Amino acid sequence: MIKGSSLKRIKSLVMMAIFSVSIITTAIVSSAADQIPFPYNATYPYGAYSCLADSQSSANNLLKSEWEQWKSAHITSNGARGYKRVQRDASTNYDTVSEGLGYGMLLAVYFGEQQLFDDLYRYVKVFLNSNGLMSWRIDANGNIMGQNAIGAATDADEDIAVSLVFAHKKWGTSGGFNYQTEAKNYINNIYNKMVEPGTYVLKPGDMWGGSDVTNPSYFAPAWYRIFADFTGNSGWINVANKCYEIADKARNSNTGLVPDWCTANGTPASGQGYDFYYDAIRYQWRTAIDYSWYGTAKAKTHCDAISNFFKNIGYPNIKDGYTLSGSQISANHTATFVSCAAAAAMTGTDATYAKNIYNECVKVKDTGNYTYFGNTLRMMILLYTTGNFPNLYSYSSQPQQGLKGDVNNDGAIDALDIAALKKAILTQSTSNINLTNADMNNDGNIDAIDFAQLKVKLLN
């Protein structure tokens, strides 16, 4: 039985929590049919870390706020043929590149915004070329920007394709598309036009490249494992293996850095850059995910080496570009390089450095005329480094029933759990508690409401 004074305290805590949540929560329009809702607060199957933030609930609130800001800057209906598109920034006259649609669709599916997702995909379909892949550059008025822009860019199309797979898992048959059919067709088009026959080398586009020129930052082995299972085409596993084979040949043995462009032998490609620059920086983001989701040993080896390079430099001193041997070629310190450095830290074991580079990622946000690229990568990597970028193809959001309230994960629900939860709330640090068990009401936040519900559970 709950005494009157205890009940009053519980009610007071609940009312304060509801009031505070109502103030700080930013609305995200999601689908009622969402089977895997945001936030995920996931524990990745592999690696020492899933969330680098001190507080999961604070990280989730930050993500909601950043998402609204990103949409305000980069989602527009202007020139979008009645739909929505991702616009770049003033530096490119607010044009659209297919890469942006890939990023935008990934973000929309992770944040659970089905209507936005569908509108972005409708825009994609307007600009599919004869190979069934998206023309890579469209101006702000909805015109393909010349003959060379008709071709597709592989990094964009693979992100579009995997987002369709995730949409199928998240929303099923609801919405304006049969996501399963769309995804399979798109993946098959990529395989037929962007994978070099006989070698499994990933081409940078549907109309050029292969063994003579490829781009390591386009390598997305975690995506290919999903594609293989989703379509039944085991050739995708060969593509993933080939990506690591090429990267092994191209990466510097001391720094671990990979080039923007190379041949399948890892040597410089004619007419293409061979530094660790604005393309190559994405390599560790895509590769780290392959470790977090699938435990691929080479992914950890490659990302650990790059992360050690950045750690030795010092996170405040990271600059936008290096030769493969590690010589600095830029004085800029932007969201592009800082966020991708944070992604690389996810495969390591230095918790102090990982938290420091995560906090730097939160801090460093681009402003001015050049905001699209860095802030978009930062947005996705903030998801990844806070446990909010699980593999939606295989992820289940169902809580572990029967463990609710076992905050300290010792197999019992008792006063020790009350103390652990109280400390976590007061210090805004959730690193030493089981988040799933502590989140009593499954709302993705650890707060006074959970504390009140845990007290009720114990008193009963």
UniProtKB/Swiss-Prot annotation:
Name of the gene: celB
Gene3D superfamilies: 1.50.10.10, Dockerin domain (1.10.1330.10)
Catalyzed reaction equations: Endohydrolysis of (1->4)-beta-D-glucosidic linkages in cellulose, lichenin and cereal beta-D-glucans
Source organism per UniProt: Ruminiclostridium josui
Active site, UniProt feature: 99 (proton donor), 155 (nucleophile)
Signal peptide: 1-32
UniProt entry keywords in alphabetical sequence: Carbohydrate metabolism, Cellulose degradation, Glycosidase, Hydrolase, Polysaccharide degradation, Signal
A UniProt-annotated Pfam family: Glyco_hydro_8
Protein's name in the database: Endoglucanase 2
Enzyme Commission no: 3.2.1.4
GO MF annotations, alphabetized: cellulase activity
UniProt domain Dockerin: residue ranges: 400-460
